[in-house]
Design a protein with these regions (language model features):
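Acidic/histidine-rich catalytic neighborhood of metal-dependent amide-processing enzymes
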Residues: 2-81, 123, 140-141, 152
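Phosphate/diphosphate-binding glycine-rich loops and adjacent basic-rich segments that engage nucleotide
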Residues: 65-100, 104-114
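Beta-strand secondary-structure signal
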Residues: 38-40, 85-89, 148-152, 193
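Solvent-exposed residues in well-ordered beta-strands and their adjoining turns
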Residues: 42, 69, 89-93, 154-156, ...
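Glycine-rich anion/phosphate-binding loop at the beta-strand->alpha-helix junction
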Residues: 11-14, 48-49, 58, 100-109, ...
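Metal-dependent amide/peptide-bond hydrolase catalytic core
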Residues: 107-281
Length: 281
């Protein structure tokens, strides 16, 4: 399956749902004996794991499980980062940009100065950071008074996550100090409004955990070789683990997710389905 070229395919995560449905149909059609199975299909995962965050976990009895939500085949993710959601609003002072620019304090310039000093992108092998949204200004001839930004910090290490978050906030403070002006005898410093909240907890499942052993044994029975990959994204598995349900992430065969080149091979989907059936068996 391929996208039409002008949009995403949606294999993330419809491929996983299709594989799960097919696996359950095979189990039912072949009368395969199995223990209790619980299936949870959440909503709004891409916009912040919303379904998983609002799910009633008292409805689930299982203590471990699998999320079908990573690219490639014969892959499993046992570790994935936690993340902080960072929202910043800077408020400077508006003025006419052509007539009296010196009477203004640009919020956009303050933001630019802060971002230019930030460590962003790949910080180290387990830590990343990004400023993903920036909005501000009302007209080309007005020194912009307000700008808002949304960013994130991610790390497998909670200490590094906190350090990166604090570093990003300190850059805004330093930029505000540098942009401070004296206007009409008054000291004008850009105001900084900050909201930092945990977005999702990290995942760290031991390689000897039952949920891993079961998947590996199922793969061996099929002649497959499940490899471990370090995760970089957030998924429902992060939230389930945070609620005490040990969950790892299995590959679904999808590639190029979130792009116009997204695709998934039917053969790979069958490969994953066979693994699911063997896990259930």
């Amino acid at each position: 399956f391929y996208s039409a070229g002008d949009t995403i395919l949606g294999a993330d995560d419809k491929a996983g749902i299709a594989e799960l449905i097919e696996a359950l149909e095979v189990v039912n059609e072949q009368d395969i004996l199995h223990g209790p199975i619980e299936v949870v299909v959440t909503i709004a995962e891409e916009i912040g794991l919303v379904g998983a965050k609002h799910f009633d976990y008292s409805m689930v009895q299982a203590r471990y499980g699998y999320a079908l939500d990573t690219e490639g085949v014969e892959m499993m993710v046992l570790q994935a980062p936690g993340a902080n959601h960072i929202q910043i609003e800077l408020e400077g002072l508006a003025s006419h940009a052509g007539m009296v620019p010196e009477r203004g304090v640009s919020a956009i310039q303050t933001a630019s100065l802060a971002i230019s000093q930030m460590r962003l992108g790949r910080i180290d092998y387990e830590t990343t950071a990004n400023i993903g949204v920036i909005e501000g200004g009302v007209a080309r001839n007005i020194v912009p008074q307000k700008v808002s930004m949304v960013g994130e910090a991610r790390s497998h290490d909670p200490v590094k996550l906190q350090e990166q978050t604090e570093h990003m906030l300190s850059c805004f403070e330093a930029a505000a100090d540098e942009m401070t002006r004296e206007i009409d005898g008054k000291r004008v410093r850009p105001e900084i409004h900050v909201e930092v909240r945990p977005d999702f907890p990290s995942i760290s499942v031991d390689e000897k955990a039952p949920v891993v052993t079961l998947a590996r044994n199922a793969a061996v029975a099929l002649g497959q070789d499940l490899k471990i990959r370090l995760g970089g994204g957030g998924s429902d598995a992060n939230i389930f683990n945070g609620h005490g349900i040990e969950m790892i992430i299995l590959a679904t065969g999808m590639t190029g997710l979130h792009t116009h080149d997204e695709s998934v091979a039917v053969a790979d989907m069958l490969h994953v389905t066979e693994l699911l059936v063997e896990i259930i068996r």
